[in-house]
Curated annotation (Swiss-Prot):
InterPro entries: Aldolase_TIM, Indole-3-glycerol_P_synth, Indole-3-glycerol_P_synth_dom, Indole-3-GlycerolPSynthase_CS, RibuloseP-bd_barrel. Keywords: Amino-acid biosynthesis, Aromatic amino acid biosynthesis, Decarboxylase, Lyase, Tryptophan biosynthesis. This is Indole-3-glycerol phosphate synthase. GO terms for molecular function: indole-3-glycerol-phosphate synthase activity; phosphoribosylanthranilate isomerase activity. GO terms for biological process: L-tryptophan biosynthetic process.
Amino acid sequence: MPVDLLADLTAGALEDAARRRADRPLSAVEAVAAAQAPPLPALDALAPADRVKVIAEVKRASPSRGDLAEIPDPAALARLYETGGASAISVLTEERRFRGSLADLESVRAAVSLPVLRKEFIADPYQVFEARAAGADLVLLIVAALEQRRLAELHDLIVELGMTPLVEAHTADELSRAFDTGAKLVGVNARDLSTFELDRNLFGRLAERYPSDVIRVAESAVKSAADVAHYRAAGAHVVLVGEALVTSDPVATLSEFRGV
């Protein structure tokens, strides 16, 4: 039987969070979170416009592609993303397979004026408080990794802390579960996180299910301006892009993508 990569990644993220919690209890993280400047209004930054908006990702590696880029200075890359016209920045904080960290998020937050997303396998409230303490404005929630009650609890906690949940789905059922939380920023990931297989046309099949007041985000399989155009034609308001940016001149690539 193949390994369920999403379950494996989520379990690992929880183990790592428990280790951090042993060194830094929740009360300490809550205190730092409370002292942060208010989160930036991500829904405004990502609101539908004449052209597709881009969430640009700081991404060193992935289970499907292995190492992508060293990125010794995430803040410098984030500044290039901002220069290139990104509307928000995603920072991988998963340590084991994506080679990210909360320190990456903190450095990016200090470097740019754009909303910043914590891209992580979130399954515990401690991780949400960590995100706010590190300066995150958005937090990813993956429907497939969470029971509905926990998904709703985490969604509500993110909102309570002033941040914006990006709720990610991969099937019609998961999309319905995302909408049931009240999320206003919902993504369809072309990559099945259990197998890491891609279905580039998935977003187009699911886009018509979105309520009119929910921002539509297309995730994965964006390698070229043609891919951005494909998602735009299917109804995407926002695309999330990682590999294509970290393996190219990010300013030039963003300019090309934003011209679609």
